[in-house]
A protein has these predicted regions:
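Intrinsic disorder/low-complexity segments
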Residues: 2-4, 23, 59, 80, ...
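Amphipathic alpha-helical oligomerization segments
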Residues: 8-20, 40-81
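A structural signal for well-ordered alpha-helices, especially hydrophobic packing surfaces
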Residues: 58, 94-97, 101
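N-terminal compositionally biased, intrinsically disordered segments and leader/signal-like regions
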Residues: 3-6, 33, 95
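Alpha-helical oligomerization interfaces
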Residues: 28, 32, 39-41, 46, ...
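Detector for intrinsically disordered, low-structure N-terminal pre-sequences
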Residues: 20, 24, 35, 53, ...
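Extreme N-terminal leader/activation tails
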Residues: 1-27, 103-106
């Protein structure tokens, strides 16, 4: 049984985790993801639910960040597009979850 809602776990993870290298999840990063999302405490359905929520919420954060960047650029404001960081994080998080699903014999 988990100690927090999926949404709160994802918010906490957003504060504690950002990929250090694109396309690579270090052991330390995987441990952070595993612990914050309480992956070991989830049954198979809860594991799929948190994965779906990660994709949905990080996708929304990506869209919002990208829209803000484009709006700032249109206004002539010097801005850096950080939206891809959300996609990198989402990919890393789903990789860790999918690895757990695979270990449990679930479809990935």
């Amino acid at each position: 049984m988990t100690t927090k809602t999926d949404f709160h776990a994802i918010q906490e993870l957003r504060e504690k985790y950002a990929p250090k290298v694109r396309g690579i999840v270090s052991g330390e990063e995987a441990k952070t993801i595993y612990e914050v999302l309480e992956i070991d405490k989830r049954n198979n359905i809860e594991l799929q639910n948190i994965r779906d929520m990660v994709v949905m919420i990080y996708g929304q954060w990506f869209d919002k960040s990208r829209d803000q960047y484009l709006e700032d650029k249109k206004k002539g404001v010097q801005a850096v597009d950080k939206s891809a960081e959300y996609l990198d994080a989402m990919s890393a998080i789903t990789c860790v979850i999918d690895h757990e699903k695979f270990k449990r014999g679930m479809g990935v």
